[in-house]
């Protein structure tokens, strides 16, 4: 599902970091080494069909690499 983030991400929490990330080997292979963390937060998103919803987002992030593999986990509204 493609989406666009409309508002800044709020309530950001770290879910996992380092070796506790299940796909750590894949992240390092695709994007390079770094201190990878899995994070979650909430933001208003615009979906492909134009609807705007509040969603919980999950993504991976490493210093110097940025946010990768962002996805909608669930809708909060």
Q: Residue spans of the language-model regions?
A:
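Cysteine-centric segments in proteins
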Residues: 1-77
